[in-house]
Structure formats: C-alpha cells, structure tokens
Amino acid sequence: MTTWDGFQAFATTPAAAPPPPGTPHRSLEERLAYHSRFVTVRTPAIDALAKNVRTLMILGRHQTVTARPSLTVTGPAGVGKTTALLQVGYACHLAHTRRHGAAATVGHVPVAYVLVPPAASTKTLAAEFARYLAIPVAAGMSQAQITNNAVCHTYTAARVQLVMIDEIHRLNPRTTTGAQSADLIKDLTERIGATFVYAGIDVTTTPLFTGVRGAQLAGHASLIDCDPFPARLGNEEPFRDLITAMETALDLRHHKRGTLPKLAPYLHDRTAGRIGSLARLIRQAAITAITALIDGTERITKTTLDAIRLDHLAEQHHRPHTRPRSRNTSTP
C-alpha cells in the first residue's frame, strides 16, 4: 500500500461483496477468502472525511502562494482511521479515472499514501515519499537532494492531487529530528500542489499540535474525530446499526439474521465500541463457523464469540474486575 503499485492494485481490485440473493453457494475456499477480506462498512467518519476532502481539494485547487488547507484524522487506536483514509484515497483515485478516462491518466498518480517511519528523520521521511513513486535514491544523496530534485519534481510531474500521511503521531517536534521532519512536511505542503490529509492516534494530545511548529500545522488543518461507536446516541443506536451492517454482509449458510444485533450490549463490552475489534471478532467467528461446523451448522453464536481471543486492547477492556474479598475483622 505504501507504493504506487500497491495502492493502484488496492484501488482497482473489486471490493469484497456478499453474493446476490438466489445465486449458487460459493465454495468453502471462496467464502474463507471473502471473510478474510470482508466488506468495508461506510461509517460517519468515512462520510465526514470524504465530504471535507472533496471540498478542500476544490478550495485549494488554484491556491499557489501558501500551503493548501489540510485535514487531520484523530482518535484512539482501532477505531478505523486508516480505513477511512484509504477509502477516501480510493474514492479520489476512482473519481480521477472516471473524469479523465483510463487511457488519459497513464502516468498520472492522483493519490499518494505515506507512513511516517518510527523516529523519522528528514532523510528517512523524504525517502518514504520517494519510495512511494519508486524514485531512485542513491546512498550519498542528501535530504535536500531527495526532496528538491526527486520528490517535489516527480510528485508535481505525476499530478498528485491528494497526499495521505499516516501515523503522524510518530512525529515529535520537541526533538531535533522531529522538529526537522515537521518542517519538511510543511515545506512539502507548500511545494507540492496537493491536498494533505494526516491520520494519527490522539494527535491533539501529542506535541504535534503544540509550540510554534504545532501552531503552524493546527492553523492549516481541520480535525475529523474518529471515535469508538457509542452504544446509544440520543434515540439512535450506532453500534447496533454497525453490527447489523456487518451481519448482513456475512456469507454463512445457516446463520440467522438478527442474531448479532441482539448481542449488541455483549459485543460493545467485548470491543469497547471499536470498529477494528468488532470486525475482527465477526470475521474470525465466521471463519470458525465455516471451518469448525459447530453443531453441524455454519452460524455464529455467543458460544462461538466467547471462544475467540481478541486484540490485547479489547481483552483488557473486557477483562472482568473482581472485588478483593474483605477480611472479617469482627471479634467473636
């Protein structure tokens, strides 16, 4: 995904989808592969990000003097930030191809996706931008040479419209290397004619938005909060709706619709409302149902779900808290 070839393969591969009603059953291997990939449920965060990115791309289309307005997706781990980012990148790639035609877009790279490496220096970060477009970087090249002669020139020539930078919380402007890397990103936003979108864990509580450099980023970036799904929001039940959407997409021969939404309180307790943990739990339960044939049927039950170990974050949340026994201090 962090190369143009990888992202292009992602953007041009048909999305996973359940079989239409009335079609023959898919084979066991096909259904296992389907639940491994599974569908991407459209969430409020994806909708908000897509709408804002479209607007900002138009807003900054003819802005050439200063950095274009940007967006930052923030939230705790496991709530779907990267998924939202990639779905918006997919939509941008698709819109570009539809607008100009596949033949006319040869050599165009509408979307770039870059991961901030751990303890990123300016050189390693610039090298990640170069690697995405397979730009040759010689061992003796300086960061300035990589940025000026390779990245900025090639990204402009490839007509990159949207640059997505993930794991932005790894930058710490309070350190020398972190400050230099933050300056590099600011420089790129002013020299590459694209809209920049960042994603990271709880970025507003990190040094990224503090100090002089943080103020520069915060002054250009709007925030999109990506939070765990609440069990209830007013008269609505967003988490139950999410479960329903995932259950509808299952391809199990004996599963009864409505089973999982009835378990919404239990599933919310298991996953803390995190879409990543919920998707893993349901996908893993579906694969277990297909391969194990519990009771001779392909269905998900609470027993199936209970037997699945989730990610450590979810398990820590779900771990029952027991009160220590109080000592009997009374005297006979």
Feature map (PLM): residue ranges:
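Hydrophobic positions on the alpha1 helix immediately C-terminal to the Walker A/P-loop
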Residues: 84, 88, 125
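Conserved lysine of the Walker
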Residues: 81
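Phosphate-binding P-loop
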Residues: 60-68, 104-105
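C-terminal alpha-helical "lid" subdomain
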Residues: 2-20, 24, 232-233, 238-332
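Post-Walker A helix-loop "phosphate-sensing" segment adjacent to the P-loop in P-loop NTPases
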Residues: 91-102, 135-137
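Mid-core helix/loop region of P-loop NTP-binding domains shared across ATPases and GTPases
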Residues: 11-27, 106-108, 121-128, 136-183, ...
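The catalytic "switch" region of P-loop NTPases
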Residues: 172-174, 181-262
